[in-house]
Amino acid sequence: MPLPKLELPKGRERALPIHPRYFPDDAWTTIRMVRFSDCDPAGILYTPRFVDMINGAVEDFFLARLHIGYHDLIQNERIGLGYKSADCDFFKPALMGERLQFTILVEHIGRTSVIFSIHCVREIEEIMRCRLVMVTTSLNTHNAITIPRPLKDALTAYKDSCR
């Protein structure tokens, strides 16, 4: 039996790279170096390591831009910051030795979740984009909880600054 033809989900167009000049001036960015240990034998960034870099950028964003310790929320407040979904579009491979710029934008803030748009740029070319849905949970009950007010306020202020 032949495999069914794969199509994009209804309502989802093929993603195209965005030039960084269209990112908001106040958007938070960080630089990550692609190291030997991040790559497959061909010297191309291994996809799971790309996801690790995205998570590292989010952790850094919390402290550097929101002034809220990611690890404090998890360790001290017992608030989980789990990913409900991560939808990544890869436009070009990332190679060993390259410096990648990760830009984080807030698309939407809900009651229990926030949607991030994370853009990875090499020089002036977007090579990857990830739409990341993060849900706040109680690490005691493992159920979704309302985003804590200080976090929601910080996310809202950042989102507003990027308009």
Enumerate the language-model features and the residues they cover.
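Generic short beta-strand
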Residues: 36, 117-119, 134
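Hydrophobic beta-strand-centered segment that forms part of the acyl-chain substrate-binding groove
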Residues: 62-113, 128, 135
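Short glycine/proline-enriched turns and hinge-like loops at secondary-structure junctions
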Residues: 44-45, 112-114
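Hot-dog-fold acyl-thioester-processing enzymes
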Residues: 2-84, 139-163
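Generic structural detector for well-ordered beta-strands
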Residues: 31-35, 89, 133
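Core beta-strand residues in small-molecule sensory/regulatory alpha/beta domains
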Residues: 91, 119-121
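Short hydrophobic alpha-helix segments
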Residues: 130-132, 148
